[in-house]
Curated annotation (Swiss-Prot):
Residues annotated as domain Cupin type-1: 55-264, 348-496
InterPro entries, alphabetized: 11S_seedstore_CS, 11S_seedstore_pln, Cupin_1, RmlC-like_jellyroll, RmlC_Cupin_sf, Seed_Storage-Functional
GO MF, one example: nutrient reservoir activity
Annotated segments matching region Disordered: 207-245, 286-342
Disulfide bonds: 50-83, 126-342
Name of this chain's protein: Legumin B
Its job: This is a seed storage protein.
BP GO annotations: seed maturation
Residues of the signal peptide: 1-22
Record field: compositional bias (Acidic residues): 314-323
Keyword Signal annotated: yes
């Protein structure tokens, strides 16, 4: 009897020990296990030539008009984009416009510059746990539809998308919806070449939208680029089509269990509406009126931020998702399963009240990285939203571990970028709608004009770091005064002023007598 009890106790102890070990291993490794099977450790990016002697602030080169909007692409052959290994685009979606379902071969990060809308992303194998009610009724009965999660978009949102994940966007707001997006074609998740590719599941978009403005014939494209021709309007180009167009209609009909007539409709052979179509019969979420009123009140608070309430509103970016999770009975835990494959958070808001750095006389900086949007750990991307007031300065610094692709969202200002040779490869005024790439380790400084200066910067690292040259947390403060004095050939008193004259952190207020 005693032997049997001892044996049972030993077996229970062994099972408990293995369970604890498994739990510990899960907790210590959950940050390294991407849910869709990517490698455990971030892989090196595709290396590109970065012999940049001169940079230019760029405007979009290719424009493609659709039925309910337009899509613009920056020239991917520009040296600065080749260096960073990225493509850059902008969607302008009219009211009731639908950006057709599509996916890309590389991770994407986009920013809502203007307007509001609805975003849906479909992860393979995840259940359709959400319901919406259609405005169209059949036999006087409302039709309810099950689907995967929908996300509200509003100005200032940053949204992340893994490679190969299909998504769509609908403008249900009262004004135009403008999105700017960076596609990281140099990311290891993209196992094709470093050319932009967009795969549409529906419609018949122009070929240029599918290829990011690039021509099918590389030689033709290079010749056109050398001649300096600007392709502003390409709305009539054909040859895009969707991925279903290439299948035989009878095989497509068998796969979906439909007749061939409907299968041919899926292939959209005569559809010339483009990539953004008008959604005649939209849909609204439950309690739409109450939610709209809440959004309007929230907008009033953001226009007049109360900094003393910052602690209460730090989680604003994810409160909607958290409410939905509580409604379905989910709870966060410390067992390494905080974010499962199907409940992954893709969106982060950047309201004024959640800024990482704030200077009441200078402006604010808000960072979106893997700490506040964990999916970025697997995409190896991050973002920075900057707001500078009249004549304020963003401290001179360099990006330690990432390229920074800067898009100007409001106002104007001056940006200076310096290479390893101590040469200014960019020193110009920039304004809304322009893009400039700051290569890794190149020193940069930004100064706002009289109208202020705002930007969104996409960075090619999940936790991009900067090293400041001036300010309270700069490299100058970390060097001994004698090292500074001898390095620059100045007196100790001058070195002390160099170290301590600026007590602000990253955003500097304008000094009296300073000029643009």
């Amino acid at each position: 009897m005693a032997y049997t009890s001892l044996l049972s106790f030993s077996v229970c102890l062994l099972v408990l020990f293995h369970g604890c070990c498994a739990q510990i291993d899960l907790v210590t490794n959950h940050h390294q296990d991407p849910p869709w099977g990517q490698p455990q450790q971030p892989q090196p990016r595709h290396q590109s030539q970065c012999q940049l002697q001169n940079l230019n602030a760029l405007q979009p080169k290719h424009r493609f008009r659709s039925e309910a909007g337009e899509t613009e692409f920056w020239d991917q052959n520009e040296d600065q984009f080749q260096c960073a290994g990225v493509a850059f685009l902008r969607h302008k979606i009219q009211r009731k416009g639908l950006l057709l379902p599509s996916f890309t071969s590389a991770p994407m990060l986009f920013y809502v510059e203007q307007g509001e809308g609805i975003h849906g992303a479909v992860f393979p194998g995840c259940p359709e746990t959400y319901q919406s009610q259609s405005q169209q009724n059949i036999q006087d009965r409302p039709q309810r539809d099950q689907h995967q999660k929908l996300r509200r978009l509003k100005e200032g949102d940053v949204v992340a998308l893994p490679a190969g994940v299909a998504h769509w966007i609908f403008n249900n707001g009262r004004s135009q919806l403008v999105l700017v997006a960076l596609v990281d074609v140099g990311n290891d998740a993209n196992q094709l070449d470093e050319n932009f590719r967009k795969f549409f599941l529906a419609g018949s978009p122009q070929g240029g939208v599918v290829r990011g403005g690039q021509s099918r014939d590389r030689n033709q494209r290079q010749s056109r680029t050398q001649r300096g021709e600007r392709e502003e309007e390409e709305s009539q180009e054909s040859g895009g089509n969707n991925v279903l167009s290439g299948f035989r209609d009878n095989l497509l009909a068998q796969a979906f269990g439909i007749d061939t007539r409907l299968a041919r409709k899926l292939q959209n052979e005569r559809d010339n509406r483009g990539a953004i179509v008008r959604m005649e019969h939209g849909f609204e979420w439950p309690e739409e009126g109450q939610r709209r009123q809440g959004r309007e009140e929230e907008g009033e608070e953001e226009r007049e931020p109360k900094w003393q309430r910052r602690q209460e509103s730090q989680e604003e970016g994810s409160e909607e998702e958290e409410r939905e999770e509580r409604g379905r009975g989910r709870r966060r835990s410390g067992n390494g399963l905080e974010e499962t494959f199907c409940s992954m958070r893709l969106k982060h808001r950047t309201p004024a009240s959640s800024a990482d750095v704030f200077n009441p006389r200078g402006g604010r900086i808000t960072t979106v990285n893997s700490f506040n949007l964990p999916i970025l750990q697997y995409l190896q991307l991050s973002a920075e939203r900057g707001v500078l007031y009249n004549n304020a300065i963003y401290a001179p610094h360099w990006n330690m571990n990432a390229h920074s692709i800067v898009y100007i969202t409001r106002g104007n200002g001056r940006i200076q970028i310096v290479s390893e040779n101590g040469e200014a490869i960019f020193d110009e005024q920039v304004e809304r709608g322009q893009v400039i790439t700051v290569p890794q380790n190149h020193a940069v400084v930004k100064k706002a004009g009289r109208r202020g200066f705002e930007w969104i910067a996409f960075k090619t690292n999940a936790n991009a770091k900067i090293s400041q040259i001036a300010g309270r947390v700069s490299i100058m403060r970390g060097l001994p005064v004698d090292v500074l004095a001898n390095s620059f050939g100045i007196s100790r008193e001058e070195a002390m002023r160099l170290k301590h004259n600026r007590q602000e952190v990253s955003v500097f207020s304008p000094r009296q007598g300073s000029q643009q």
